[in-house]
Structure formats: structure tokens, C-alpha cells
Amino acid sequence: MYTNIPQQQQNIPQQQQQNIPQQQNVQNIQQPLPHTNIQQQNIQQQQQQYQLQFQKQQQQQQQQQQQQQQQQQQQQQQQQQQQQQQQQQQQQLQQQRPQTPQQNAQQQSQQSQQSQQQQASLGQGQQGSGPNTPPQSQPETIESIFKQLDLNSTGQQAKDILEQCKLKIHSLESQQLIAQAKYKLFSLAANYQSTVFQHIKMVSTTTTPTSTPTTSTTNTPQNSNTSSSSSTGTSSSTIGSSSSSTTTSTTNNENLGLPISKEIYQQKIQLWISIITFLRENLQYFGKWRESIYISIQNITQSTLLPTLIQKEFFTELFILLKSIFSFVNIEFPHYIALKEVKLSNTHQCLEYQNLIEPYYCRAAKLSSLLSLSSLSSSARIVGSSILLNQDAMIGYTNQLTESPPFFTSNRLLNNKYSTIVHHLLSQSASIEPIKELLFPQVQSNTLKSKIISIITEATISKTMQLLNKYPNQIIENQIENNSWKEWLLFSEQFYFLCENGLVDLEQFIVTLSEKRMNNGDPIKDNMVVLLISKTIIIQDVKTLFKQHLQNVNSNHYGHLIPLVLSFVNNDSNYPIISQNISLYFFLMRINTNTENPEIIAHIKKLLDNFNFQFTLFQQYRNWWESEKVKQKPEFFTTIQDITYFSIICNVIPTEGEMELIRFQSNGSDQSIQFPGVGGIGTVVTGKIKPVSNLILLNLSLRCRRKLIQESVLLLLDKEVPISPGFLEDYCRTVHYTPGPVSPFLFSYFKKFHRLAPIHAVIESVSHRLLKVLKSNKELAVLLRALQDIQTQKPIQNIQLSRSIDYLLLKASISLPVDLISAKEIWKSLDLGLFNNRRLITSIARLIKLKGIQDFNRISDVPVFIENCFKSNPYCFSKSTLEFFPDILKNEFKKNSENLSLNPNQFTNLTLMKPPTLQKVQLENQQRFQLFSVGGKLQILQKQALVQQYLTDNNSNLLLCQVFIYMLENKIKMDVMGPLIQQMFFKQIIGNQQPQQQQQPQQPPPLAISNQQLNRITSVFIDFIFDEVYVNHPLKQENLHQHVSEFLCQSIFTYKILTLNSVLLALLDRDDHPSMPTILDTFLFSSAEIQNRLQFFSTYPSDFFISQSFRNDDNYFIKNCEFNNRFNDLIPTVIDPNTLIEQSTQDTILPIYYSNSISRLMPIVEIIISKSIELNNGDLFEKTINHFNIPYHYYQDEKETTIKDTLIYYYDSQLFKLNPELKLLFLKLLNQSDIDNRFSNIFNQFLKSSRIEDITMVGSTAYFNDLISPLAEMMDLTNQNVFDTFSFKTENTFSSIDISNPLELKLNNIILEILLLPLDSNWIANGLVSLLNYSNRNKNFSDRKIDPPSSSMVLALSIIFSILPTQIHNSFIPIVTQNLSNELNFSKFKSPIMKNQYNFGNYTTNVEEKMTEPIEWYIYFIQFYYLYCPLERLLSLNDLVTNIRPLIKNVYQYYVLLTIVSPVLLRFGTQTNHLIQITREMLQILTDSYLSSYIENTLQDLESCWIGNTNDDDDIMDTTNFNLFGKRIGYDDDDDDEDDDYYDEDDEDEDDDNEDDQQDENDRMDFSQDTNNIFNRSMGDHDHLMMMSNSENLNDPWSDKNEFFRKQKSIFLKIDSQLIDTIIDWIYHIKMIFPFQPFRDELLRIVKEFKPNFLSKFNQLN
């Protein structure tokens, strides 16, 4: 892959490798083959020999061809005779039956075709031959020559055929043909050796060789790609790309498994050896190094399946091949290719094989460790999958080297670690998606999948045991409200989904769980386990599993699983009989329904009798059910007893429970419901108002809930009349409680669009209840496409529906999830309208600035969307808004402005719909004064003329401006113009001059102006106010503010020409004008209309709307109807000018379920808060929160997340810098009853006293330690019961709180508290970083020896910093850089041992995950910070590398920096300039004078055989089992009395107890005291080593002639050589994985600047 073999090296001596001894020592094999002039001369001589041999071979071929031609001529004559006989027979038949001319023609054509085919078969390829030329043989190809090889060929025949193929290749003229032929020959040979190997293996396992020959051969086809088809890895696809067409044969005796002769057996072995020898002798000729390694390793692994007598012979040949391949490493191909294949291999028990593979295996493991995140890489998934960073595509925590997840081998420590993680996810109430994301990143191997499934199964067993011990012997009856039932219910849902997706081995679960014991030592006897298993029996795979165990039935038992399940039944007399009956009956009845065997049914009856099953108890439930389901119930089961009974019925008889609930939802109540309407008259529907109890919905089986959703959708969309509000709320809550996609059931109906009422009901439910579900399911893109299709297909005539869709788009656009940016197809054509497009751009800016977007390529389509929006309506955001945009969006707007030749400093509305000038409006008013003064009493013809005149965009934009000027100049009052504008905007005026059209039934007349046009008119009108009236009208601005506010209120609330949302959005889009805040203040906070609507909330108890949310208010619909009946703002109306009666603009008034004018105002409130911060307007900020805090708390879906994002986005705003106490106003938007539990005690004390000294006096370190420690404890993997203290209120888990996960909630509260602190960023940054500074090297040892931070604390800090705003980032990065510099400087005297090393043949992991060195947790902290931080902050990693660069003096220090950078490198994208920049920074460090000299001197010392000249290699310390920081892995240090604490190596005064504790908790270095002293005084200072090596005093311990020093220096050189090797491997690796040509060019340019010895390691990089 890396190597382009020169032409002069393609012909290699055939016998170059034949003289390698089979028993040669592995350590002597790896000497490189030098490139010398002698070798080139030999190659030229051998080329001449090949030519002579080829000429001889051609002469022999010509003789053979002549003989074949003679034989073919004889065969042709025989065939011609046969053909003549056939023709004579056909003529006789034709004479007997006459034929038509068509049949004669067909017969002649068939005869000609047969003759052509015969000629082609006799002489194919005879081009240019005359008619009398005898037929010639077909030209030979590689395939035709290779076909001569079959399973009956001898070894010598195989060798001759392969050499003949090779000679044929040399006869080709084109280099391209030669290359193709070489690849073909290698593929044929590789595949055929696999075929022979599999044949030998098959014969060896089914036959016994004897001395009696009994063979008879027949040619039968056989697949030659047997082994390669079953193999894994990338090489298998390469080798198996072309299969051999050779036909092979086996004897009948072989197929029957009878004895065969030893001669035949040996012939097959020699045939295989000949092919392997040919491949070995032509390694350089083919240049297929990676494929050759794969062949050898794969066959070595399979050789263990052969009989013992022949294993040695096969292994020897393969081992010689493998040694020959590895002898060319770094000569003909880079070591990186060997690393990739070795990493995928399984180990062999042979010591020779281990000695050969181990260096490469360990080297591959070291590179894999470098590319992976440090230490707790997997625990980051626990937080990363759940916290609100929205990392939808995480960095690979596993082995990037082999492009596969970690190999789950027999190492139980590693498996238990991942099992613990899954258990932790289950405890967080996580769905199966984070679990799949954790363990299934591109898994292809079925074996690996089974191991992962086993790990998940162990996690479910662990979770089951946790619940069993937490709630021992819980009864099923009367516990429906207890936390135990809710936790079991939640886990049963998770367990069901895992089983449904095939992620749990149920058989393993049952068998293993039956072997477990409770904490008190008793066996498991709990009916909850039986109920847990019973729920999964409806899954098809589970049905199949139990059916397999129901086949063999006898009098005692059937199968082994069912008795194990029944062993969990608790039929103790002290246990309630009803509880055991429920679980037992539930399980056995479901088993019974899956079988038709009468013996099994009888056996189930017998089992029930054995358990003293009491059918009378169920008869009692049955009687209750029969009586209840015929009753007419105003409400559906409200008492706890009835809910418990119904839950039992739904689990035992699910169909009847479903049907009864659906029947009740559809028409279960005779109560009449009147929706809001016009004039107090609205649509009347019969149904129920309140939803059913949450307990009923939660206790339904999953099957019932899914069925209920499907049936509800059908009733919702296909019903002619509107559905009841209780039914719709039941549907929404069921969707919340049932994980799964929503869009397939709802949005497919939008395409029909023939019933407006159900579509409006869906829009209402999605806007207020299901939007969060769609976002979590990543279905928001589907929703936006569906809504856009509705709007683009045809104008929506129902303006009420159109405005509801506008509100849904607004709400979706201001809270985009990060996954929507990945939906690339949507951005190229997305258009949500004038106002919503601008909201989308603002939301994108927040996402880029706040969230940890994966890489720069993810936002590549966003500029396309911005460009399209700018073209359709060129709008520039104000300077105050652009100030907070990320740089990438600022540059986009600057570029678009330059393309339109606009001034980038001009922050006015640049819309193409320019407002009319004031002079033009006044002129139009003068001309139409007499007409408009009549108002709505105009004649029909006059109204029609006006409508036609104002239908065009320009004139329609002019109309509203004219009306405002009339009112402003007091010429025509609004009560005259209002009704006329209503009729012109909302109705087509039809006169009486067309009576013939009225005789036919007509559809409602289309609107004169659509809602989209009204939005544009609103925007133009606001522009007219700011750009024309405020500039050119002589009226004072104070009076203008009041007139504008009055006109807007009348247009919105009295005449409903405009909508409140569109007017506010248009005003907020003009934040560049200084009068906008004043108008907004007057309009929002001084107008009586809005104040009256806000006062509605005071009619209820003062704490009602604060104590709960509309999402869990069963009486919400009643309150909402009361509001809409009092303030009918959502139904567009017109006023009849004659009767002055308000009428609807449309025949159909759509039912309103959730909306009102104030609830739809909540997204606008968030925008106003943001604008007030941008404009540094504290008065507007305070007024907005004080006026709207109650409805905001009641209606808003995600308060905590929204407040947190706002504080982060605007953290460095002038408003909060000058008035930091204003941030505390956000607390008014939260639930006041939860504040004490939400924040820390110190912060709560500060809120009560308002004295900041309550926090500062405590100290930043103590304050943040108290704040973050609870989160670190929750993230600790070692505590599986960490969530036991939390009460799972399941009915609130999905719908009633913003964040359902307790870990998410805790993290969010910590972030919120830090952001609300009225303290500067430096104080916060220093306090947080101080939690990492557990040592001060300037103090004595006794003052420095403090326990290091836990890994979960470091992880929590890194994630908290990544979420906190950029201002804090700018404060803490210099601190962390300085601390890392100090540790790197100190590390010159520490052990540069590689971290997380792997033992050969297995993985070792730091399971306890203890960190004892400061540099450990700084690596860990910085890695995860840059993994999660927002995209723009990622570039600061370049600055960190630049600042650290001057301190890099040795290889170990560079390796530490590389450990930080390499796992995060993928976040820079695969084809970006940022990737080139960070890589350039890292590689140029290697060219610095000090480090390059250090590397060069180290390589020279290695060449001088420092390691090899040591007398006793056993005395040299084995560094494989040490990690990076001097910790020994996998060794028992109980016998070592030395304290290895890094703080003080010479400490002898420590207490023995402390030393014992240190030994128990942490792994320690296995150095002696003297070794430590010398090691620490010399390591890392190469000049010091060179100085010591020049000493001539033999008694000097630093003399290079001192044996002890030589051994120590050998250790250091070996460690440095390992680090240098890993750095080399990393450079090869990044060159492989980033196919970006500018990147590769820059990499090669820098590599060429390396010094000679180091540069020689990259000969194969090109």
C-alpha cells in the first residue's frame, strides 16, 4: 500500500529464501536485508537467466502446440462426420413432415450457429487466418495455465505450473498488463493454497490414512475460496477478490469418511507446501505484504485444528513464511502494515511464534493506546451520551488502528468494566441507543457481537440483582404507587427493548440469574423476576427460544429453561397469594398460547396444581372485569384498587384491556364539549375532557401502549368530527411513555390534506406536547420537510391553520437540536419563511458556539442555507447581534454583503421589499381619501376594484402604511378603516351580478391575501415606521411611540389584521433602530390588551401556575377554553359593516386544544430576553422577566436548558459584566419550590442574604469541591448503587420535568449555579482548576502529600469546563497550560514508561482507574475537554501546543503532548486546513534542535548496541508491564517494602500504615531504592547521560564502564526506542487515515527535515 516497487526489483531470485533453516532462532531472523550494488548485479544476472529459460520454454511450447494441433484436427474430422450424420437424420424427418418457410429459415440459422460454435471451440482466437488454415490452440493465459493445477497434482507439478505462470508474465510487454497478471497470479495461488489447506483439514478430521491405496479420481468443481469467505479483516476481501476456476476432485472414500492411503495424504500436503514455498520465494516479486501476513497468520491460527501428527509440518512452513515476511519490514514495506494485521491476529501457543509476534503485537498495542483516550475513556460515554452536549457522533474510544471496537477476549476484567458501564446507563433510565452507541461502533464480526451481547446480558443481571436486594420480596398488588414498582416498571421496559433488539441473551440471563444468591445468601425467590421474563415472551425470538425447549416433554419437566423460571416463583405462605398467582399465571399462560401440543397444555395445568394455583382468585378479577366494562363511566378507573385490577387484566388479557380503553377514549363519555368559537358559539363534541390516569397508561403492557398509539392515530386522522381533548391528551402521554418513532404515524397523513380538523389537532399536539419527543428521536428534520411541503404544495386557505403551522415552525426553529445540522439534504432546499429563516440562523449560531459539534465538515451545508436566505431576502443582522455570532457565520454574512456590493457596516434591513416612501403614501391618501372615508359601506363593485388594485405585492404593502398615516394624521379613524381592511385581506368580495354561480354549491372563496403575504406586509410596515415615519414625519417621537403602539394593538386584538407574533418578530428584527426598544416597551408593558391577558393568571391561586406545568395539569383544557372564550385572538374574524357583528373569515373554525395568545408568545419572550442582553438594555430585560415569569414557567417546555444556553451564549455581554446581579432574575423563571434542592447550600445562603461574601469567604476551592463532588460520585463506576437515593417518579420521567436523567439534572444544576454566580470568570476558573492542584512542589513533602483527585472528578471538571462559556475558557487555558508545563518540566526526572500497556495475548486495563501522577489527570482532563468543547475553542489546542513546544526536551515529553493531541485529531475534520495546522505544529517540534538531537543521539546509541552488548539480558528490566507513569501492571507488590510515591522518593519517615494503604490502593514501580535514585537523576537529561558516559573512572558509578550504569542506560535507551517507535507508527498512521493531499504533502515536507537517522525510518512513507 505504501510501496511502489522499482522495476529493477520486480524480478527476485527464486531461491533467495530457500536456504533459511526451518529451526532458525527467531531473534536472529530479523536482520534486515541490505540494498547493495551486489544485489542489483545479481538481479540483472537473474533477469538474463529468466530470458534464457523463457526462450527454452517457448520452444517446448511450440512443440506441444504442434502436437495439440494434430490431435485437434483428428477431433474436428470426427465431429464433422457426426454432424453429417445428424443432418441426414434431420433431412429424413423433414421429408416426413413439410415445413413452412419461416421454419426453414430458423433451421438454417440454427445450423449456421452450431457450425460457428464448433469452429470457435476448435480454434478460438484464430484471427487473421485464411479459410484453409488449420485450427490453432487458444493463446495461453494465467488462468488457463493455472487450471492445469488440481488436487491430484504433485508438489513438483505445482511448482512447474506456478513457474510457468511466472514466465508467462515476463513475456508480456505492457507494464500495466504485467502488474495485473502478477496480482492475478497471487490471488490464484493464495486462494488455492487455502482450498488445499481446507481440504486437508476436512480429510484429516473425517478419515484415517492407511497404507492401502484406494483412490480413483473424478473431476468435480470445488470452491477455492473456502477459508477466505469465512475470514475477517480487510485482507480477506483483497485475497478473495478473484477465485480460482480450478476443478478439484476427491475420492468417494474421502467423501464417505473411509480410510485413504498415506501416499495420497502426503501428496496433498506436498501440493500445499509447494504453493506456500512459491509465495515465500516470490515475496518481493509480488509485493503483497499485507496479504501475505494475513495468509500466514490465518493459517497458523487454523493449523491447531489439524491432527497433531501433521501440525508441526504445517506450522513450520507457515512460520518460515512469516519470518521471511517480517525480514522485509522497513526494507520493502513499512512496519505499519505488519502492525495492522498482527493486531487482528489470535495468538498461538508456540513460543517461537510468540517471540516473533510479540514485538509487533506490543507495538500495535502501544499505537492503539496512543490513539485512544486515556484511562476512563469508556466512562465518558456515560456522561457523553446523556448530558446535553448533543454529541451525536463521538470520537472513537477504541482501537482506531484496526477500525474495530476493542476485542472482548477472555479478559473478564475488561468485560466487567463494560458491563458496569451498561449497568450505569440502565440506572440512568437510558434507552438502548446510548448502549448501542457505546458497544456497537461499526461491528461486523458475529463473534464480537455475541461477546458484546454477553456483556449487556451481564449488565441486566447485575441490574436485576440490584433491584432484588434493594426491594426484597415486593408484592405486586397494592404497590402500584411505590417507588419499587416504578423502578421495576422502568427496568422492565428497558429489558424488553434490549430483548426485542437482540441485545440480551435471554437463555444466558435465566441460567446465570438462577445461580445467583441474594445478599443474605438465599436463592432468588421473587415473582418480579417471573413477571420481568414474562413480558418478553411476545417477542418472536423469545417465542422461538421457548418453543425449542418445549419439544421434549415428559412427566417431570420440559426443557431446562422453564423449570429455571419457575424456580423464581415465591409461593411462601407469608407472601401474598395473589402476587405469586399473577406472575405464575402470566408466564404459563403466555407459554401456553405459543404451543398447540396438548401434552404441554396438560403439563401446564399440572404445574399450576403443583404451585397450589387458585383459579378462584382470577375468577374474582374476571367477574369484576365483566361488570365494569359494560358500565358507562364518566372517568376511566380513578381509584388505586380499580387501577390495580385493570393493570392485571391488561397483562393477563391484553386484548380486552386495549379494546375497552380505546372504546372509552373514542366515545366513552356523553359529556358535551364546546371548543372556543366566534360570538360564544364553537364546535360541540361529545367525549371526555380529562385524560385517563397516568398510572393506567404507565402500567399498560408495552404491546397495549403500541396498539393504543396505532388505533389512536387512525381515530385521530380519519374521524369526520373533531376528537375530544381527553383523547388527544391520552395519545400524547402514551407517546411520551412509549419509546419509538412518531413521524411514520402522523406526518404521512399531511400529504392527503383533505381534513383540516385532524391536521390542526396534530399541529397543536406537536407544538405543545410532542416537539421534545421528536427532537429526542431526531425526527425534527422530518417534521420540517412535511410542513414545508404543505406550504409549498398550494397556499393554505384556512388562515387559522396557517398561523398554527407558523407557530410550530417558530418553536422548532429557535430550539434546534445539533443532529439537524447533520441532515445535509435539508439545508439545500429549506425555506421556512421570512421570520423563521432568521430564527434558524440565530439557532445555528448558538449551536456552533455552544455545542460540541463533531468536526468542521458537519456545518458545510449551513453556508448554502444562509446564501439561499440572503438571495431571497438580503437581511443583515444588527451589529449587536453579530457580535455574538461565531466567526464562521460572521464571515458568511460579510461575504454575501460583498457579493451584493453592500456596505458591511450597514446594519439596516436590506430586504428586497423596500417600504414605500412617506411622500408616496401621503400622495395615495390624498387621491383615495373620499373612497376610504366611506369605509366598509362601499358598494360591492367599489370593493372589488380596490381588491384587484391591492392584490399585487407593492400595492398590498402600501395599503397598511396608508391606513396608519390616516390614523396618525387623524384624517380617518381606525374604526372606519378596520372593517374595510378586514374584508379586503380575508375575503373575496363577490357581488350579485353573477347569480348563475350562486346556484351551484361553492367552496369557501379563497383568501385575498395568504398568511405568508401578511407576514411580508407586516415586515414592510415595520420598516416603513422606522425608515420613513421616524425619519421624515414632523410628529414628535414621544407621540409617535404611543400612536404606533395603539395602531398595533388595534390591528392585532380588535381587527385581527396582524398577529401578535409576527409584529413582535418584525420589531425585534429591527434592533438596529434606537426606537425599537421604546416601541416594544410601550406596546408590551403599557397596552391594556396585553395586561388584561396577563391578569388572567391572577384569577387562580397565586401559586397554582408556579407549582405545576400545563403538561401534568388534567384540567388544562378547561382553563385554556376559559382564556380563549374571554380573549378570542386565534380565530380570525371580520366585522360586518352593516350589523357590526363579528363573523369568522372561514366556514370551518378549527378546534383549539392547547394554544392561546399568551402560550404562543413564550418563544417570543425568549427572543426578547436575548435582544435585551444584546442591546445592553437592563430595563427591558427586567420588565420582560417580571411580566411573563408566571406564564413562562407554566407553558415553557425546557426552561432549565434554555436559561443555561442563554447564560452561556451571552456570558461575556456588557449587560452581565456591568450588572452581574441581573443574572439572578432568571431564577424567577424556575420552579421556586425546587430551588433549595437544585443548588448548593452555600449558594442558597447567598440567595437569602444577597451578600456575595457568603461565597468568597468560604474560598473557591472549598466551594467548588462541595458543589462538584456529588456529580463526581454519581459518575463513579465503582458504585453501581449510586442512583439508589433517587426516587424515580416515572409518571414525571418523560413529560413533567425538563431533564429526566438524575445525572443530567445534577450536571445542569451545577452549570446553572456557576453561570449565575455574580463573580468574574477568573475567580471561577481558578476555583475549578484548583481541584486539580493537589500538590505544591514548593512546599515540604508533608504539606504536599494529599490524595489525588478521582478520575470521575477529573472527568466532571473537563465536561463542566467544556460547557461553560468562552470567557471562562480564556481564563483557565493559561492556568492549565502553565500547570502542564510544570509537570512536563518535572517529568524530566520521572519514568518515561508507556501507559496502559498490554500483556501479550491479552489486554490489561487499569480497572481501579486510580491516578497517582499529576500529569496523568492533566492528560485526561485536557483530552476530554477538547473532545467536548465547542468547535471554535478546539483551535486553542494549537496555542497550547505552541506554548508547550519550548519545554519539549526529550522524547517522553513529546510523547505526553502527543498523547493529548492524537485522540482529538479527528475532530479537526479529515480535509480541513485546521487539521494541517495542528499536525504541522506537532511535527515541527520533532525538527527543533534540542529534541531532534536527542532523537538522533538515541538512535546512534541504539546502533552502537548498548542494549545488545549487555551480558545478561535477563537483568534488563522488562518495560512491557509498566505504564507511562511508572506503575507496574499485573504484578503483586506485597513483598516490596519500598514506597514509590512520586512526591518524595527518599521519604523514610512515613508511617508504615500509610505505606500499606498506599500499597493496597495503587500499583507501584518495581524499582529498588538505588535504581530509583539513579533513574530519577539521569532519565530525561540526555546531555547528562553523555557526560556520564565519557567518564574513565571505573569506580565512578556514572562511568560508562561501570556495569550497573550500563544496565541502567540500556533500560533508558530501550524505553526511548519504544517511544520513538510509537511516534513513527503514529506518523504512518495519520498519513494513512487522512486522504487529504495537501495534508500529505505538508507531512512529507516536514518529515524530510528530520535528521538522517530519524529520517531513515520513513523510507516507506512515500
UniProtKB/Swiss-Prot annotation:
Q: Which UniProt keywords apply?
A: Activator, Coiled coil, Nucleus, Transcription, Transcription regulation
The UniProt entry's coiled-coil ranges are 39-122
Q: Please list where the region (Disordered) is annotated.
A: 1-24, 95-139, 206-252, 1530-1572
- How is this protein annotated for GO cellular component? mediator complex; transcription regulator complex
User: Where does the record say this protein resides?
Assistant: Nucleus
Instruction: Specify residue ranges for compositional bias: Low complexity.
Output: 95-124
Q: Which InterPro entries match?
A: Mediator_Med23
Is Nucleotide-binding found in the keyword set?
no
Keyword Transcription regulation part of the UniProt annotation: yes
- Which Pfam families does this UniProt record tie to the protein? Med23
GO annotation (BP), single = regulation of transcription by RNA polymerase II
Q: Where is the composition biased (Acidic residues)?
A: 1532-1560
Quaternary data: Component of the Mediator complex.
Task: Family membership, please give it.
Answer: Belongs to the Mediator complex subunit 23 family.
Instruction: Quote the function comment for this protein.
Output: Component of the Mediator complex, a coactivator involved in the regulated transcription of nearly all RNA polymerase II-dependent genes. Mediator functions as a bridge to convey information from gene-specific regulatory proteins to the basal RNA polymerase II transcription machinery. Mediator is recruited to promoters by direct interactions with regulatory proteins and serves as a scaffold for the assembly of a functional preinitiation complex with RNA polymerase II and the general transcription factors.
The protein in question is named Putative mediator of RNA polymerase II transcription subunit 23
